[in-house]
Structure formats: C-alpha cells, structure tokens
Design a protein with these regions (language model features):
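N-terminal helix-turn-helix DNA-binding module of bacterial transcription factors
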Residues: 1-57, 342-343
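Bacterial carbohydrate/catabolite-sensing allosteric modules
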Residues: 7, 39, 80-85, 109, ...
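Short beta-strand segments enriched in small/hydrophobic residues
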Residues: 7, 12-17, 52-67, 166, ...
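Amphipathic helical "hinge" segments at domain boundaries
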Residues: 27, 42-107, 111-115, 192-195, ...
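Short gly/ser/thr-rich secondary-structure transition/capping motifs
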Residues: 39-45, 99, 118-121, 221, ...
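Short hydrophobic/charged patches on amphipathic alpha-helices used for structural packing
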Residues: 48, 102-105, 127, 164, ...
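Short beta->alpha connector loops
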Residues: 95-98, 119-124, 243
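Acidic, Gly/Pro-rich loop/turn segments at junctions of secondary structure
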Residues: 117-127, 139-148
Length: 343
C-alpha cells in the first residue's frame, strides 16, 4: 500500500479510502490511485481484509437475461471496478423468472456476499425481501416500483424523448413505438419520454402505434407485423430494446420495405453490429460499462458506511446518446407501405 501511495502522490489513508470506499475521495486522486495500483499490479490481500473487517470481499450480480448483450457489458464494468479493489463477483441469471431470482438471492445471502447488484425481472419480489434483511443492494437498469434506497440507470425518459425528437425533426408524424413490457421501468420511462416529445410537437399518439409486450426477438416480429398490417402503417418506428429491434428488422426485410426510403427506424442499445446493418442503424446508446462501474462504487459506499450515514448520491441517472446513421431520413409523401407480406 505504501508503494501505491508513493507512486500516486497521496497518503496511505487515501489509498485505504479508495480501497474501502468508506471515505469520499476526489475523482482526480482516485484515478491516480487506481493508475498506480494497475502499474504496480497491486492486489489487495482479500483474506487479510476479510479477517480484519468480517466481510467476504465478494458481491453478487443478478441479471434477468444474460443472452441480452446489454447485461454482459454492464457486468464487465462491475468486474473491472471490483477487481481493482480486490472484490470477486458472483454472477446469476434469473432468466426473467421471479422464482429463480428469489432462489439466486437466497443463495447469495447464504454465501454471505457483502452486497448485491440487481437488475430485477418483471413482478420481482426481491426488494421487500432484501429490505427485511437490511441487506446492501443497488438496483441497476430495471428499478422496483417501490422507492429503493440506491439505484443506477440510464435516464430513460430523456432517452425516449431523444428518439422521438429526432424523428419529429425529420418531419415524421406517424411514429410508432415498440415498447416492451411496461412492468419494467426502462420501457415505462422510454414511453413517457416518447409521449413528452410528441406532446411538445402537438403530434397525437395513436393507440395502435404503441406496441407493448415482452422483450424477445419473437415479440419484435409480432409487433412489426402488426404495425405494417395497419390500414395506415407508420412512417417511422422506435424500438426500445436490441432484441426487439432484430425482430422488427427481420419483418422489414421479409416485406422488402426499403429503409429509410419507405420507413425510418431507431433502435436502442448501440452495439458494433449496428454499424454493419445495411443501412447502419440509428440508435440510442447507453453507457453500459459506466453503469456497471458506478453501480459497484455505489454498492461499496453502502457496504462500508457507518450507521446513520447518508449516501452522497443515492440515485444515479446516466445520460444516453443518439447516434445517427442511415436508417432514418426525412419523411416524404410516398405510396402507402404494403400492408401484406410478399407471397
């Protein structure tokens, strides 16, 4: 620890504060300490710390769907931040099932992890159970209906607003949105942002243009076919999840609908393959790695705080970014989009 302090130009107590997360450290000093630890390949002695503090130096992470590319990126951010401070990470996948989620949380509790990061599934009962146990927890991405003590997520209201505003500025008014499950906070919030942008522009939201359901590829197929079978189909679609986007894009390809000449589309989550679609997909990018990193840092504050201490920033909202490619274009008068798939 002395070597880390010497190289980073801070005191050993500052290094200890960075490691334990129990005392605020300025971002600049914290970064110097982390860079020194990396340069020296410094690894805190987990066993010694555990004996001294009574903690296991392990946390649990429970995600609802590990096959969704969003969550591995979040977990990577968690693991990188945790590894620097000598913490191990136990990863569980609830597979969108509340019972499985409950089983995983009970197992993590029995293993005496120091805390849990949870992206809850729909109809989750985890919050009440963990509050009863007074267990350190941060909700990540998907937030409970009940007000939680600590949360980290994208600013999803603004993200939904950005997507709609982009299409409105291109002159679109017949804008549909494939929302996903409204029991999940990101989809509720994105729909709220969408409605806010439409209201500001005095463009009515047509009920038949709001498609709610689950968040898998097949749900995108169903939503896409339903929208394009309307007597007056939309000229633009916002899709609120990367798996849903794949389903909608498949429908557009099967119906041979030209993007963006006949229909504009905005997706959510900006992964590398979005650049290689033809045309490249305009998308709302979320800072998934940053979300994971800041979630771990917030959990560490909860784990190490003294009784009665308040968290300096218990609810963190991370800005999303609109990345414009070639799947969106100005609205223009055209013949109606075909309402029946090709034979």
């Amino acid at each position: 620890m002395r070597d880390v302090a010497r190289l980073s130009g801070v005191s050993t107590s500052t290094v200890s504060a960075v490691l334990n997360g129990n005392v605020p450290v300025s971002p600049k000093r914290k970064q110097r300490v982390i860079e020194a630890m990396t340069a020296l390949d410094y690894q805190p002695d987990a066993v010694a710390r555990s004996l001294k503090t009574g903690k296991t130096n392990a946390i649990g992470v429970v995600v609802p769907d590990i096959t969704n590319a969003f969550y591995p990126e979040v977990v990577r951010g968690v693991e990188e931040a945790a590894q620097l401070l000598g913490y191990s990470v136990l990863l569980c996948d609830s597979r969108e099932d509340p019972k499985t989620e409950e089983t995983h949380l009970a197992a993590l509790f029995s293993r005496r992890v120091d805390g849990v990061l949870l992206a809850c599934c729909a109809n989750s009962v985890a919050y009440d159970a963990m509050v009863r146990r007074r267990f350190p927890m941060v909700f990540v991405d998907r937030l409970p209906v009940t007000t939680a003590e600590a949360t980290v997520s994208t600013d999803n209201v603004h993200a939904g607003y950005l997507a709609a505003k982009h299409l409105l500025e291109l002159g679109h008014e017949r804008i549909a949105v494939v929302v996903g499950n409204l029991a999940l906070s990101p989809h509720r919030d994105r729909l709220e942002g969408f409605r806010k942008a439409m209201q500001e522009s005095h463009v009515p939201v047509r009920d038949e243009y709001v498609m709610c359901g689950n968040v898998q590829v097949d749900d995108g197929l169903i939503a896409g076919n339903s929208l394009l079978s309307l007597s007056m189909p939309p000229t633009a679609i916002i899709v609120n999840n990367n798996k849903l986007s794949l389903g909608v894009l498949q429908v557009l390809d099967e119906r041979k609908i030209a993007i963006p000449e006949e229909l504009s589309i905005v997706g959510f989550d900006d992964y590398i393959w979005n650049r290689y679609f033809n045309p490249g997909l305009t998308a709302i990018a979320q800072s998934t790695h940053e979300m994971g990193k800041r979630s771990f840092e917030l959990l560490l504050q909860i784990i190490n705080r003294s009784p009665g201490d308040e968290l300096p920033q218990p609810h963190i909202r991370i800005a999303a970014e609109l990345r414009i490619r070639h799947s969106t274009a100005p609205a223009r008068p055209t013949d109606p989009i075909p309402t029946q798939p090709p034979s």
